[in-house]
Every structure is written in structure tokens, then in C-alpha cells.
């Protein structure tokens, strides 16, 4: 869901977003042979996007390590992208990968034949060649710490950034939180009493590391300081609008 400036504008492509999600996801849900198992901290990702999964010897997934007849997928992997900052609807995206497992040393190697990414704007089928060639966003591994620090230590800066948001997007807003950041920009979650929306603040140039990100955010804050101050965020009663 987005309002105000176009959400996800000048952002990562679907393949890069899928690889970023895969790189930082901590848990993996696997559906195979009619069963479903959840694995936590058990997967790594190869450079070409294959998933290496460590499973117990008695796992039912051992049976899924043989390709299905006619090359049909034998398993579906699901990953969730959870916002590190407490907000409503914390699932920012989901990634589904259909394919099959092959045994290799101490791992099962999952080779995807179909990759689907569901974002707030809808679901998209990711091209397999683009998925294999893509790299995670350079800030993906530090995003959680950056966002929680911004929300906890610099709420004044977050509110100042709302000066860059169209006034109609802030109507009846009760809280604004940093939702996501990548090398292209920062996304704010604008919460209202009964709804929420996301607004994208695009950087003037990509940020490939934390130092560059700091500079990009300072530029946004400078722009915000020069902008007209928006109407103060309304503090609604917990029991609803008046």
C-alpha cells in the first residue's frame, strides 16, 4: 500500500529485492511431499541463488531430495521479510520458491524453477536468470540495526523527514516509523487510527555502504529543514477518531 510519493520508486528490482530478502531471512518454511516443516537458522545462499539447507537426518525432507516425475517441483520454500521496527502489518514481503532438492555433503541443495515475490504493490514472477545474477542490496545485512537505531534514538529526525511528505499523506496520522531502507532510499510507514500507508523518500544517489547512507540521510534532513513544517501529527485516542 502506498500514498503520497510513489512507493518503491527508484528502488531495487524484483530480483535484487528477492535476493536481499533471502540473504537476511532467518527462518524457512518448506512444503514437500504433503508435509510442512519450519527451519530456523538452517539455510545459507549460494552466489547463484541456490539455497543450502541443513536438515536433521530423520527429516521428512530426505524423501524430497529426489526430483519428481517429469521434472515437476518437489518442494516449495517460503521466506518472510519482517520489519525490524514495530509497526502494523510487519510482513513487508514474502518470497516463494518452487523447485527440487538434491543431496550434497551435509546439505540439501535447493534449485529453484520458479520464484515469486509478493510486495505491497502485488506479486511478481522473478526471472530465473535475473534472480541467479542478482546480488543482495549492500545495506541488507545492516538494515535492521539502522532502522531500529533511527526509530529509537532519533524520533525527532523521523518526524522532521515528514516535511518531505505530501500533506494529504499525513492526514490523520498518529505515528510515523522508518519501515525500510536500501541503497536507493528510505521508506516511512504512516499509521493512522484504522489504516496505514507507506511513503518512499528517494536518495539523490545510491548508497553502497553505511558512510554513504549517513550522507544521503543528512541530505534528506537538510531538504526537510528547508521545507515548510507540516501540520503536527494528530494524536488520536486509542478508542478511535472523534
Residue ranges and their predicted role:
Residues 1-242:
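Binding-site signature for planar aromatic cofactors or substrates
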